[in-house]
């Protein structure tokens, strides 16, 4: 069963605000299923957004648990967040945390084509640093690059209430 956002008033639908969350978040948490166990890894990422279609790129070692799991079951759940700050109150129930986040489901594809890997790593580095980098086949041959085709995502935000801003 698919569920929607419980707190609809926190849903973010404005594309500029969604892009801001993607730009400010530095880490994507990627959840997978390893047999009958959940498995989660935090990773740096790059992204493209074309016509509302979100694609993420991550990289890492060419072997290990993450690669083994994704070869068996490429379905993933992603989460990223930013703008984390405490919200204080006079009563315990008034405390909370402000945030902006994106969550979604997708399919991970382990890239094999050197050209596609070079392009993906360039996107990742541009997202993370704002700078352009070039890669060659030798460099991409020693790293795995994973593309996550995000099928569905939602964005939410809970800003600090105006009266509590410092």
Annotate the PLM regions.
Residues 23, 63, 71-76, 123-130:
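Short, intrinsically disordered, mixed-charge
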Residues 2-9, 83-166:
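Charged, gly/pro-rich active-site loop segments
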Residues 31, 44-46, 79, 107, ...:
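Residue-level recognition of well-ordered beta-strand positions that form the cores
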Residues 1-29:
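Short, basic/aromatic recognition patches
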Residues 32-34, 60, 80-82, 150-152:
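Short, structured patches in soluble enzyme cores that scaffold and shape functional sites
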Residues 65-88, 95:
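Helix-adjacent hinge/juxtasegments
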Residues 25-62:
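Short beta-strand segments
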Residues 24-28, 41, 52-54, 72-76, ...:
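A generic structural signal for short beta-strands and their flanking turns/coil linkers
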